[in-house]
Amino acid sequence: MVDLATVDYFSDQAVTQDPYAYYDYLRGCGPVFTEPHHGVVAVTGYDEVLAAFKDHESFSAVNAIGGPFPPLPFEPAGDDITEQIEAHRHEFPIFEHVVVMDPPAHTRARSLLAGLLTPKRLKENEEFIWRLTDTQLDEFIGTGACEFLFDYAKPYATLAITDLLGVPEEDRAEFRRALGAGHREGQHVGSLDGTPVGLNPLHYLDEKFSGYLTERRREPRGDVLSSLAAATYPDGSTPDLLEVVHPATFLFGAGQETVTKLLGAAVQTLGDRPDLQQTLRDNPALIPAFIEEALRIQSPTKIDFRLARKTTTLGGVPIKAGTVLMLCLGAANRDPRKFANPDEFRLDRKNVREHIAFGRGIHTCAGAPLARVEGRITIHRMLDRMRDIRISEAHHGPADRRRYSYEPTFLLRGLTELHIEFDPVG
């Protein structure tokens, strides 16, 4: 029996595979609790995580990706360290990307994304998503089996975002190969060895997207990249090229991670809960609720970080300026104070849309609407074209002794592989 009080969340391999007992332990110590190994304040309560997300005056997103790694590049001094944060911002991981910005810079950068993934544009793109879903399923459906992440989820997520953005057809195969190639320099996101993520792990995309956006500024094409190339700041000024390249590359890279992990969790649930398959076939209107519950119970982003810029309180607990906070989305979405029987997958959960898998407040995930569309259409077509979707016992063991492997990262929650078998329809 593991003594959870001794567990180091940031290096323990077992916790990456199943973090939920540890989250329960932390929550039992209090919804706002300082873990002993790194002095990080773990926020596990739903209300408390929500409050931190919404209070960007007190909590900076400057360390949202790295948390305690690397350590702060300065020694916090006083009850308001805003000036110190701004003086050292360029020393934090991915400092040029919107996910770690604070207002007013965040407000300006986010304004460039405001008109991109609108309901109207997603609706216009939906016909392509339906076609892409079938095209990707066609690659393996006749075999009655696949490794779902490699054969479907990863290429599908890449091709969906390349089409929506307007990446040229001739470059799409290259992106599919590159993004399936594994490790790239600077891509230590949530590494268990304490290695910090590089200052810009998406730099490999900058040259390509600089070219695309330069072309769109010269010759608009009516796609998302053209809208981004033409975007102006609220004051009417035109962004520099890199100021539009970075939102594009972040949307392109980070969005695929979220979609791939969501699809893996959803299909894993279908295989482990065969009773849900016919329920969803009989009533496809329940598929959106199924996707939301999959997001809640297996949040693709396990944690997000904040840095207290001011001495304040959270959930009645004093927080000193300079404190690193770990907002545990995976724990908050299973907080029994918010979600009844939180460890159960329930298709009829009335408040499921209140989960915070995509964050909340000014940093709500910009790609969330697209992820939901891709999840809904994928499950719909899989249920149409397959019967008896089941988890491969040869790879994952029998139903009562499943063996799943998750990515060894403290930040994200995603399977490393998912082997399924099924009976093709027709």
Task: Identify the meaning behind each predicted range.
Residues M1-G426:
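Cytochrome P450
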